[in-house]
Amino acid sequence: MPIVTVVPAPPPVNFHNRMAVRVAALMAVMATLLFFLPYLNWLAAGFFAALLYRRRTGYLLSLESGVRLGWITGVLMFVIVTILLTATVALVTASGGFSALPPEVRNALDPRFQEAMKTLQSGPAIAELLVMLFMFITLLSMAGGALGAKLSGRGQGPVV
């Protein structure tokens, strides 16, 4: 009689999967540190989250699972970016805004930056910015997760 080994089904990729959340959180922090590369860092976070998940667990990710892992990474990145944005706006507002800065400093700032900070002083503009950030961060991270799942090595193990 042949010996049959039963391989347990890999855990689904969601917020209940501790390894998936750990990998996503690590990539979210790393991508946030690369804030000077917008769009590319969000795409890369999803991509490397899928590769790191594959490496740590040994499970191949299906395209759907890669998108889910990218989405988890994107949501965590959005939370981090929102906290940083809120802290920045609160600090600037508490110190009297940009009008409290010395004229030399105000004139040295990029005019686009000055205009953006004036815009961020209205509630609807902040809400619009947050919605756009959520869309960009999560969609690019999901695309990166799908790409990472696709390129992480087909045919080498069970697909999650």
Feature annotation, model-predicted:
Residues M1-R18, R154-V160:
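Low-complexity, intrinsically disordered extramembrane tails and loops of integral membrane proteins
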Residues N14-A28, L120-Q121:
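Short hydrophobic alpha-helical membrane-embedded segments
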Residues V21-A25, V67, W71, A127-V131:
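Hydrophobic alpha-helical transmembrane segments
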Residues M27-L52, V81-G96, S122-S152, Q156:
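Selective recognition of hydrophobic, aromatic-rich stretches within alpha-helical transmembrane segments
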Residues R54-I72:
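Amphipathic, cytosolic membrane-interfacial segments at TM-TM junctions
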Residues G70-T82:
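Selective transmembrane-helix segments that form parts of the transport pathway or gating/packing helices
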Residues V92-G123:
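Membrane-interface interhelical loops and short interface/amphipathic helices
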